Amino acid sequence: MVAITAALVKELRERTAAGMMECKKALVEANGDIELAIDNMRKSGQAKAAKKAGRIAAEGIILAKVSADGKFGVILELNCETDFVAKDAGFKAFGEEVINAALADKITDIDVLKAKFEEQRANLVAKIGENINIRRVAALEGDVLGTYLHGARIGVMVAATGADEELVKHIAMHIAASKPEYVKPEDVPAEVVAREHQIQLDIAIESGKPREIAEKMVEGRMRKFTGEVSLTGQNFVMDPSKTVGDLLKENNADVVNFIRFEVGEGIEKVETDFAAEVAAMSKQS
């Protein structure tokens, strides 16, 4: 039997918005498997939707640049500990230097990039007094590349064909706002589709629907699901009367790939219990 820790219950609560006792019960029934617990809670109606693991917590900036010929682009995340340092001129200048090198030398291996700038990073840490991390880097190549930065916290890069600069920029802005996970509905992995199909089928059957009717209901729900998680299936944020796919078709354009970075995705800050910290310090003194 897996121990059901407070941290596990807390994570499930954050991802489902369900009550503490419901989360603990679901984890016990799932033997500590949080993904299974979420699936079971969705089937029973306790959780209509589950958030992805990892709160947006770390600070830093996203940078994105495209080569002069417009065929190669790099997007980068540089982390620090506080919002104050994220706005620091020295921190930003370091980020510019790193992304310029990644672009010029086509460095897409994060370990290679980190090694190249380790000495400068260490010097900046000593100067600023905060830990700094070149967290991730990614690149795209294509006929038409476009980028969009929402402040410095969200960055998007899009590779397209048959599109002009303005269209690619609008698509990138849509991606920043709507967070698609795939380019087209058919790109959604079979295992993701199968898992969602089973959840929706169980929900329909448990609501009292005969299996045959439940299957037909789920077909419609699955079309909606794959559309919602894919770029071309989503309603375009600037004109919800059409999908992004419709917009691309109107312009004889296509999106080959995209990358969306948001500062701190998947990183959770350690929360300090101030009262416990004071109590611990008083015991030491």
From Swiss-Prot:
UniProt cross-references to SUPFAM superfamilies, sorted A to Z: Elongation factor Ts (EF-Ts), dimerisation domain (SSF54713), UBA-like (SSF46934)
Primary localisation category: cytoplasm
GO terms assigned for molecular function: translation elongation factor activity
Matching InterPro entries: EF-Ts_dimer_sf (IPR036402), Transl_elong_EFTs/EF1B (IPR001816), Transl_elong_EFTs/EF1B_dimer (IPR014039), Transl_elong_Ts_CS (IPR018101), UBA-like_sf (IPR009060)
CDD domains: UBA_EF-Ts
Domain of life of the native organism: Bacteria
Keywords attached to this entry: Cytoplasm, Elongation factor, Protein biosynthesis
Subcellular location: Cytoplasm
Annotated function: Associates with the EF-Tu.GDP complex and induces the exchange of GDP to GTP. It remains bound to the aminoacyl-tRNA.EF-Tu.GTP complex up to the GTP hydrolysis stage on the ribosome.
HAMAP family: EF_Ts (MF_00050)
NCBIfam families: tsf
Protein family membership: Belongs to the EF-Ts family.
Protein name per the record: Elongation factor Ts
Organism: Yersinia enterocolitica serotype O:8 / biotype 1B (strain NCTC 13174 / 8081)
